[in-house]
């Protein structure tokens, strides 16, 4: 199921069993099929997808189009799968000439061969399902699913200077040499394993998070905001946003050094939700658990767990790995 997700660096797929075990202590599992799981920061969709599989009806939100597309494909969509005919339709020449990808992202992000294909395919992509498949394609050809280090890989790859590419990129050389249709077929299989029905009409929206929590109704509110003092998603994934026609957004207030205060403001409008579940991290030692517990405790009783967890393990420094901690906060009104 999780193979269907975009490999965001802040994804929570490994934490889902822990998150939902804690939820079961406050909301029994036998009630989940009749309960609503509200996800204020959808991101990759890992937690909402897991909640969908557990039987919750999902109401989720994100401000980024890439996440909204993921939600429409994996959360709202209960039955429509990617077919081989869809793949061939994306590959069909449309006479559009060079597009934004070939003009702006060669050679720093894509080789010309892949850029030209992606321009054609995105022009043919008429549904969120098509767009999502192409986002999966992009991550499949990006080294370590990141969008940096053009001098280490993309420029020598485009020029055929393979001897200048470190051996750690050997797999990524092979990935980039695959024909587009072969990549699409692989990603088709991964997307389809994440598409299923849970018997509910699940809902995805694209709203400011303050507006969303004011309008949403549900039993569990899950918040996994950008962590204060960390790399902003708007910067890390600006290539994807530009390809999807999004205007460059300012850095989220939740990513700033004062991000915890922004989260405190959000909680002011969340009293109607019986259970809060909050994922957060120490940003390699920049954030303090006690501060977040204090913010949540202003509104309700609070339980906190801290554990070691690595994001981007393949590229993070050893020092950062040793310092990184993940937190799970539960705010409840139980006696």
Indicate where each model-derived feature is located.
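SAM cofactor-binding core of SAM-dependent methyltransferases
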Residues: 35-96, 103, 122, 132, ...
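Conserved Class I SAM-dependent methyltransferase catalytic core
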Residues: 256-309
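SAM-dependent nucleic-acid methyltransferase catalytic core
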Residues: 108-221, 226-236, 247-249
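A short acidic (Asp/Glu
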Residues: 48-52, 69-72, 214-218, 231-238, ...
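Class I S-adenosyl-L-methionine
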Residues: 289-335
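SAM-dependent methyltransferase catalytic-core segment centered on the flexible catalytic loop
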Residues: 220, 227-273
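S-adenosyl-L-methionine
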Residues: 1-38, 46-47, 53, 136
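Conserved proline-anchored active-site loop of SAM-dependent methyltransferases
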Residues: 37-51, 60-64, 207-209, 214-235, ...
């Amino acid at each position: 199921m999780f193979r269907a997700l975009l490999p965001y660096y802040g994804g929570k797929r490994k934490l889902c069993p822990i998150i939902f075990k804690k939820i079961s202590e406050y909301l029994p599992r036998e009630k989940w099929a009749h309960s609503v799981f509200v996800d204020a920061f959808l991101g990759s969709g890992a937690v909402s997808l897991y909640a969908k599989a557990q039987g919750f009806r999902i109401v989720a939100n994100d401000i980024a189009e890439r996440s909204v597309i993921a939600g429409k494909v994996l959360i709202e969509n209960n039955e429509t799968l990617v077919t081989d005919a869809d793949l061939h339709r994306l590959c069909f020449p449309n006479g559009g000439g060079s597009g934004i990808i070939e003009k702006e992202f060669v050679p720093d992000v894509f080789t010309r061969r892949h850029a030209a294909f992606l321009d054609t395919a995105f022009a043919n992509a008429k549904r969120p399902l098509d767009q999502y498949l192409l986002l999966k394609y992009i991550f499949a050809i990006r080294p370590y699913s990141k969008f940096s280090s053009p001098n280490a890989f993309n420029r020598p790859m485009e020029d055929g200077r393979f001897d200048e590419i470190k051996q750690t990129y050997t797999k990524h050389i092979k990935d980039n040499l695959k024909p587009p249709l072969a990549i699409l077929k692989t990603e088709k299989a991964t997307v389809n394993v994440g598409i299923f029905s849970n018997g509910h009409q699940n809902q995805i929206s694209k709203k400011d998070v303050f507006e969303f929590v004011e309008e949403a109704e549900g039993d569990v509110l899950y918040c996994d905001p950008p962590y204060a003092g960390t790399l902003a998603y708007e910067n890390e994934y600006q290539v994807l946003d530009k390809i999807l026609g999004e205007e460059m957004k300012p850095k989220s207030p939740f990513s700033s050094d004062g991000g915890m205060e922004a989260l405190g403001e959000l909680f002011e409008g969340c009293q109607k939700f019986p259970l809060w579940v909050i994922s957060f991290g120490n940003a390699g030692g920049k954030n303090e658990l006690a501060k977040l517990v204090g913010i949540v405790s202003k509104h309700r009783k609070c339980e906190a767990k801290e554990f070691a967890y690595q994001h981007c393990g393949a590229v993070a420094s050893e020092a950062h790995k040793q310092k990184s901690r993940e937190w799970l906060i539960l705010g409840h009104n139980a006696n």
